[in-house]
């Protein structure tokens, strides 16, 4: 199910038809990798978990489907990503507004964490995602990236996705295919701010980028 701004919901049966074959194939081929599945639907989450998914990424933070929390609590080995989003994908980019950006998102996280724990989900199985590009203006997104440390107060792993998102084009009107420079810059900032998981499209490019940074940082001086 696409979560792009303006995207229409996908019926549950269609989502299952899309996920089950590829998830089955991936898990059969690679038994040890960690698999995260994006879904707001409890039935899809349950099927994915039974096929070996390790993480459920719910962009609604357990609000869309009242049975999602029950499915997750029934599988205590599975972790969940709770993402902040103002509105729904169909309308989230229609004049998003905050009186207190960080205060409102942190209050949302506190409420969702409390709800998850009451439903039997372990605190240390929760990841938080401030939702870059989900119900935020470009300015909001830049503010979030500049101050991601504001979310460390929850003492939970942080997840951020910035890859090719529209806020990058705010600066130069670039197309989706032209946003790799901005993607890497935003990803670097997120890493420096202590983000634990960076969601990306081009794994190889990001791996190379961070490997080079690591190599440079490990060298005390350059010799010709």
Please provide the spans of the model-predicted regions.
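Conserved C-terminal portion of the radical SAM core fold
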Residues: 117-119
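Active-site metal-binding loops of divalent metal-dependent hydrolases
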Residues: 132
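Active-site-adjacent loop and "lid" segments of alpha/beta metabolic enzymes
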Residues: 3-28, 33-34, 39-43, 49-50, ...
């Amino acid at each position: 199910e696409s979560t792009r701004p303006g995207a229409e919901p996908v019926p549950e049966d269609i989502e299952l038809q899309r996920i089950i074959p590829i998830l089955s194939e991936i898990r059969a081929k690679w038994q040890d990798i960690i698999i995260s599945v994006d879904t707001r639907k409890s039935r899809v989450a349950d099927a994915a978990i039974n096929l070996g998914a390790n993480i459920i990424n719910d962009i609604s933070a357990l609000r869309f489907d009242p049975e999602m929390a029950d499915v997750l609590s029934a599988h205590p080995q599975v972790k969940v990503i709770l993402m902040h989003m103002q509105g729904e994908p169909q309308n989230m980019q229609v004049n998003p507004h905050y009186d207190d950006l960080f205060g409102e998102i942190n209050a949302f996280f506190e409420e969702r964490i409390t709800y998850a724990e009451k439903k039997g989900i372990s605190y240390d199985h929760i990841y938080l995602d401030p939702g870059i590009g989900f119900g935020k203006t470009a300015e909001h997104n830049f503010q979030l990236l500049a101050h991601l440390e504001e979310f460390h107060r929850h003492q939970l792993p942080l997840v951020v996705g910035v890859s090719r998102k529209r806020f990058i084009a705010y600066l130069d009107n670039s197309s989706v295919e032209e946003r790799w420079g901005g993607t890497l810059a935003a990803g670097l900032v997120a890493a420096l701010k202590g983000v634990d998981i960076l969601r990306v499209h081009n794994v190889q490019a990001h791996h190379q980028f961070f490997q080079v940074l690591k190599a440079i940082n490990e060298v005390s001086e350059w010799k010709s």
